[in-house]
Each structure stands twice: as structure tokens, then as C-alpha cells.
């Protein structure tokens, strides 16, 4: 199955907050979304963990 799990990490504090899935065949680039970080107590950019 092409859909694989990945972890999203906060760019500010480097805390791993979210686990999600994506289809790596259709979207080979790293995912970047704005999500809430409980440690920073604000919305920050979260990038796909390496």
C-alpha cells in the first residue's frame, strides 16, 4: 500500500505533536502545515519529520 505514516514536528520547539498519513507516490515532497503546538501555546508551522 503506498500510504505511509509520518510524524509532524513543530519548527519552533521541535516537539513531535501529530501523527498522520500521506500517499508518498502522489506527494513526494515534505508536508508542511500550520497546527496548534501545546508546548508553544500557539499555532506554528509543523513539518514532516525526517
Curated annotation (Swiss-Prot):
So which domain of life are we looking at?
A: Bacteria
Question: What Pfam families does the record point to?
Answer: Ribosomal_L33
Keywords assigned by UniProt, alphabetized: Ribonucleoprotein, Ribosomal protein
Is Methyltransferase one of the keywords?
Answer: no
User: NCBIfam families under this entry?
Assistant: PRK00504.1, PRK00595.1, rpmG_bact
> What PANTHER family does the annotation carry?
50S RIBOSOMAL PROTEIN L33, CHLOROPLASTIC (PTHR43168), LARGE RIBOSOMAL SUBUNIT PROTEIN BL33C (PTHR43168:SF2)
- What is the designated name of this protein? Large ribosomal subunit protein bL33B
Species for this entry = Metamycoplasma arthritidis (strain 158L3-1)
The encoding gene is rpmG2
